[in-house]
């Protein structure tokens, strides 16, 4: 059965200066709510493959593109959908993995996994669970300009009044001529 993506992708090219351009590619993949048409996880996987095709087309046209892929992926880090979007090899995207600024300043024992970092971005009331399903992914070029210390999950009082997601902030220092 062929299904249509309910939400598309938004692509925005930003000419920061005459010598610097970046592309934002945003998404909101299928929610976790069950649908009668198909399995929602499979639907997200198919949407993720379409998004990765778009990422690959950008890299084919501009191999050193300054690309940021972001949004509500409705998928955890180990899902096939997210792995498809991140990709492999030269065009693999970098996960910024933002965390709350909660005062912890000890270096993690393993830099790839920091158990003290609070990284959840979404509360799913039906399952009473907190998870990270919102992402900011970067091309290799953007990753070089990414400021880790300026990237975090915003912690606000009453955050859940307006949304079941928490905002993410990422900071970059653009290099001219890229």
Language-model segments: which ranges?
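A surface/extracellular/periplasmic glyco- and lipid-processing/surface-interacting theme
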Residues: 15, 19, 44, 68
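A long, amphipathic alpha-helix that forms part
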Residues: 41-63
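Acidic/histidine-rich helix-loop elements
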Residues: 1-2, 33-43
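Metal-dependent phosphoester-hydrolase catalytic domains
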Residues: 4, 13, 56-68, 75-178
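A short local loop/turn or secondary-structure capping micro-motif enriched for an aromatic residue
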Residues: 31-34, 178
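Active-site metal-binding loops of divalent metal-dependent hydrolases
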Residues: 29, 72-73
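Structured beta-strand-rich core segments of catalytic domains in phosphoester-bond hydrolases
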Residues: 1-29
